[in-house]
Amino acid sequence: MKKKILLTIGCLIVLLVAAGGGYVWHVLHSVRSTAGQMYDTGGGSGNHQAITSKKPINLLLLGVDERKNDRGRSDTIIVTTLNPGKKTMQMISIPRDTRTEIVGRGTTDKINAAYAYGGTKMAENTVCNFIGDIPFDFYVKINMEGMSDLVDAVGGVTVNNKLDWYDEGYYKKGYHYKRGEITLDTGAKAMGYVRMRHKDPQGDFGRNQRQRDVIMAIVRKMSSVRSVSRYQSILKALGGNVKTNLTYDDMKNIVFNYRDAGQHSVDYEVKGSGKMINGIYYLVVGDAEKQRVHEMIADQLGD
């Protein structure tokens, strides 16, 4: 459940856990400078001891649309919990239109507005409050334009498309996305695929699923890359579009300590009711659903 990995593109964590130890270990030895380029403490310094001790960790994955002179909003919000003991990776997506308190601002708004108002830290505090005051150990933020760069870097991806439509939206390229297995051979074509919402009867939920599919397709493609030139293109795409408070050593420790967490994956999207409030559409999440999400995360963080 996620709008644009995730890192859902997936996000660096998904890539590290899902790609497998051997190849990623080789990669990490070669990406110290890239890791340094990605390192940022905008969301806090991180809980490095948890990774060293092989404790369950909670990560906030943000997909943002940042452009020059525009911070944008975090249209992808995924709470990812890794538990090496239970060998599970749980990913809970929070729809961008979710109505909630914006912590630090004293207002109620769409949850994706927190990033626009106060950057990573306000987004982290707001999501933490929404899930019942469960803190995050780390965050990973990707500029979603970077998904386009990554698809180009891996040489395109193949996905199973459940709908049939022409792109008349964000890119307006007129691409025809046929139902069934299709190849998104360029970043632009992939972006048109993951951004479409209005032609999908499931709206945001359907878009989130397509984004997850593309993220995992990127993960699979990355895990099989052996070309040096392709590898360098991937590093460039990551370094230019990802920010995280995970250090290089944290990434290495994730490879060793959390590789089993990818054996069982739990994917969930927060549910609610769509409502118009003062002329604005929101997804209103009930208390029972919030409690369910809180308990799902708390359970995964238990030993």
Range-by-range predicted roles:
Residues 2, 10-11, 19-303:
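Non-catalytic, solvent-exposed segments at the cell envelope interface
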